[in-house]
């Protein structure tokens, strides 16, 4: 069905998510110039560089070897589990689902389309079941946060794709936020901290309560907590006067005013903080590449980081105080913001796509 639609549309260029494997392999037979997109940092295994879900820094040799051994072991274990499950039978005998990540299932798609799965994919990298070789990849990250010398020449760092003027239609807390903003503008400047632990995973109520406790000891700060639709403000208990918690916050509006942010290490929050020049305290929940983002934030000097499940309220308070009072954090992220949002950086993606489309 996908191939039929593409034949009718006859596009000049395909932009496909790096994890949309059926679309990548299925469309390969059409000869349409293709680029892949991702929010990830470089996924391939490179000398002296950890996998993107690791807390470790470059050149921690023994630790990096152990990290990559873990990645391979986890991948093999996941493959075995799937093969011995009901889904494993479906992978072998069909039908193939559009979102499958099973290499067994993708082999059947590759056979039908003439795609050489072994030659054109890389199973040694971080992403399951594989990455792709010889295909341009556009990542919405900045090269300055990458570890090592950067990925292969196919990997292009186009920077944050943040709509800074967007209206968050789902933001049920907009009125409460704007009332707080009005009060803030009637008095002398108070540091504003924004906290969001994402909208995909269930909120870590224990961590959020520790954040509230930290703010309660600092009545000279204002704290806004956006729950991303993953929890109710009532779950946090009674809140001090300087804390506002809402089910959905108008994130870009709040970040435009914030002096520091507490985030979980997701790529969207990382890039939005960069776009607005807001130093970060990353309290990683350990999902996907969050630990790796936490390591990059601290390594670049644009924030501090901890494991969200264990960080204490007193540590949160102390680290926020550092972010708010030590100029180096705001200086570093302001400089990174200038690089990330500069016209040459934005034009790179356009130039690349136009060049690819012109190859047809």
Model-based region annotation:
Residues 198-199, 224-232:
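Glycosyltransferase donor-sugar binding loop
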Residues 194, 212-227:
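A conserved nucleotide-sugar
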Residues 14, 246-295:
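A donor-sugar binding/catalytic signature common to diverse glycosyltransferases
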